[in-house]
Regions:
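Charged, solvent-exposed interaction patches on well-folded alpha/beta domains
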Residues: 1-89, 94-264
Length: 264
């Protein structure tokens, strides 16, 4: 069998040259990591335009205060893990991720805790409850959510008022109409609407030690009460006038008890 050494030599040389060219192209076109600096910082916050407390300006300010804002810094000295851990110390941050790219970009991705109700109790406590029924501290920022006042301790706020607020917010009508929850000494619940000069009394929330059934029980309770109120709004107040009554009691089934304003 005749071996064509010339052909084999040519093929081998072609392979060597091809491999070298690929290596050289990759090597000389790759950025010099030692001299690469951060040219842009992308701060992405999930739900930034809703009722959260975070914005890109605040995040930049927080990182600058810790001397961790990466813009203009050598990329090799940008500590992505430290940036993540620093941002996670904020009581308003749920998750934080930071990554670097070879073209000098630093990307920061945040998800935030979303407040669903603000608590202003009779004992002068002032804080928020988030969408996971956990306490958030007060802040200089405000957002358009329900305020709960009255006889509220932190246990009741987390276990019941947060669920009541969620139930109201899931309905577009009540999300726009109800602006305040007031808890009486016996835990009876009053609702203060945006439209209409009256107070709505719905009674006591159903209480249970079964966590998995508590939310459903409160949802059913709220839906039942507010469906009746919606019908009363539609067929009663629309005829009598929105400011005719000062107190509307929908605690009991099959009846609505109203108290007129003194000048009505």
């Amino acid at each position: 069998m005749h071996i064509n050494w010339k052909k084999i030599t040519i093929i081998t040389l072609d392979l060597i040259i091809g491999t070298y060219l690929v290596f050289a192209f990759t090597k000389f076109n790759k950025p010099d990591e030692a001299n690469l600096v951060c040219t842009k910082v992308n701060i992405n916050i999930q739900d930034e335009m809703t009722n959260g407390f975070l914005n890109a300006k605040e995040i930049k300010k927080r990182l600058e205060a810790r001397k961790l804002y990466p813009l203009g810094e050598p990329l090799k000295e940008v500590n992505a893990r430290m940036i993540e851990e620093t941002l996670k110390t904020s009581p308003f941050v749920k998750t934080a991720e930071c990554s670097k790219t070879q073209d000098g970009l630093v990307d920061i991705y945040l998800t935030q805790r979303m407040p669903i109700v603000r608590i202003k109790s009779i004992s002068n406590e002032d804080y928020y409850i988030d969408d996971h029924n956990q306490i958030m501290p007060n802040t200089n920022y405000t957002c358009d959510i329900i305020i709960a006042t009255g006889y509220i301790n932190k246990w009741y706020a987390k276990k019941y008022i947060s669920l009541l607020s969620k139930a109201l917010m899931t309905n577009e009508l009540w999300r726009n109409q109800i602006e305040q929850i007031n808890v009486l000494p016996d835990r009876g619940i009053e609702l203060v609407p945006r439209v209409g000069n009256h107070i709505i009394y719905i009674g006591n929330l159903p209480e249970t030690n079964l966590i998995d059934k508590r939310e459903q029980a409160i949802n059913d309770f709220v839906n039942k009460k507010m469906n009746r109120l919606e019908k009363f709004y539609k067929y009663g107040l629309s005829q009598a006038g929105w400011n005719k009554y000062s107190y509307i009691n929908i605690e009991f089934d099959n009846q609505i008890i109203c108290k007129k304003h003194q000048n009505s």
